[in-house]
Regions:
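Glycine-rich segments within core transmembrane alpha-helices of 12-TM secondary carriers
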Residues: 1-6, 198-208
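Helix-to-loop junctions at the C-terminal end of transmembrane segments
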Residues: 12, 118-131, 216
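C-terminal membrane-cytosol helix-exit motif in multi-pass small-molecule transporters
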Residues: 27-46, 235-243
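Juxtamembrane intracellular "pre-TM" segments in multi-pass secondary transporters
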Residues: 42-70, 96
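Short amphipathic helix-loop junctions that connect adjacent transmembrane helices
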Residues: 84-104
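Loop-to-transmembrane helix entry/capping segments in MFS-fold secondary transporters
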Residues: 101-102, 187-197
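Structural signature of the two symmetry-related core transmembrane helices
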Residues: 134-149, 229
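Intracellular juxtamembrane helix-capping segments at the cytosolic ends
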Residues: 172-185
Length: 251
């Protein structure tokens, strides 16, 4: 993926119309991915309720789950609001960057993906051994720092450090996103918990890009402050849970 992104960035730099061919490549690869998933062996899981709306009851019944969803919503909205506009921010001369397609590819994929590959295993090791709430706050701090560096840096390589930090945070964030439900959900209700988590992820994923572009046009790089505030709030709401979990030695 990194090697392909490297060549794709150079290819678009040579002729902007090459993006059309790239789109067909993406379609072909996505189709192969879908076929591979189709032939994966079925995994038998503990069956829960089949009512798609019944899962929402856990937001009311389970305080730990509710707090984590609120925290994740704040953090995700803050992070995605900034992240989804990076390509525009890096490529558009209006914001003082005007990087080439290859440079944008370096910043948005090659550097963060490379860092993510390197640090995924260490984060997985920490996930199994560290208090989850503390781990989540550490990840939030790294995400917030990455956004501030990217939007307030004055050189390509300082921005690259920021996108590298984003990759570092995503290495742990990806593991946390996929597995945190297993820390708190009863086995027979894991799918229901995950459905709410996925639903709220999609919700902020729809809102964040539109909000991000609106803020970029109206307040410029101060969008980083907006994101940092939301990410800080996401960490603050976890503090009571950190205290409680340490007293009870849970998570």
């Amino acid at each position: 993926g990194i090697a392909f992104a490297w060549k794709a960035g150079q290819w678009i730099d040579s002729d902007i119309n090459n993006f059309k061919s790239l789109l067909w490549i993406f379609v072909a690869v996505s189709s192969l991915n879908a076929i591979a998933f189709w032939f994966m062996p079925k995994v038998e899981t503990v069956k829960g309720s089949t009512n798609p709306f019944s899962a929402f009851k856990w937001l009311k019944k389970d305080k730990k789950f509710r707090v984590l969803i609120i925290s994740w919503m704040l953090m995700g909205l803050g992070n995605l609001t900034a992240l989804k506009i990076w390509t525009e921010y890096f490529a558009n001369d209006q914001y003082g960057n005007g990087f080439s397609a290859f440079e944008v590819t370096l910043l948005t994929f090659i550097i963060p993906a490379g860092v993510k590959i390197i640090f995924t295993y260490p984060w997985g090791w920490l996930f199994d051994r560290m208090n989850f709430y503390v781990l989540r706050v550490i990840l939030n701090v790294i995400f917030g720092a990455a956004i501030l560096v990217v939007f307030y840096a004055d050189s390509f390589w300082i921005i690259a450090i920021g996108t590298g930090l984003q990759g570092l945070a995503f290495a742990g964030g990806g593991i946390a996103w996929m597995l945190w439900v297993t820390k708190i959900a009863p086995p027979e209700h894991t799918a229901e918990y995950m459905s709410i988590h996925t639903f709220t992820t999609g919700l902020r994923g729809v809102v964040a890009p539109a909000l991000g572009f609106y803020l970029l046009v109206t307040i410029g790089n101060s969008i980083a402050i907006f994101s940092a505030i939301l990410i800080t709030l996401a960490s603050v709401v976890l503090i009571p849970e950190i205290i409680r979990s340490r007293k009870t030695n849970q998570l």
